[in-house]
Amino acid sequence: MASEPNLRYPTEETGDRGPQGPPGPPGPQGPPGPQGPPGPQGPPGPQGPPGPQGPPGPQGPPGPPGPPGPSGLPGLFVTNLLLGIIILLLLIIVAILLVSKLVVN
């Protein structure tokens, strides 16, 4: 049956084809596409602020002992010598004052 010619519109009786109809309305929007690949890595951020100051370090070991001091006898001798000279000068001044007082009288 499908091989029989269409008898309702024989080719001899059909007229010229009419003008083309207007275009149909646009179809519905398609589904969204797949997600794209991730973008490239951004540049490194700025340097952060300096951290807090650390705790003080442990106390260092004690230093080596100092050299021995000078002997005490020469220092004592110099001190006694200076005191003796000062006392001697004071006695000479007192003697001069006493002699001058006696001479004036």
Curated annotation (Swiss-Prot):
Q: Where is the Collagen-like domain?
A: 15-74
Membrane-spanning intervals of the chain = 76-96
Question: Which residues face the membrane's Extracellular side?
Answer: 97-105
The molecular function GO annotations come to: extracellular matrix structural constituent conferring tensile strength
The chain's Cytoplasmic topological domains, given as residue ranges, are 1-75
Q: Where is this gene product found?
A: Host membrane
Q: What is this protein called?
A: Saimiri transformation-associated protein
Please report the organism this UniProt entry assigns to the protein. Saimiriine herpesvirus 2 (strain 484-77)
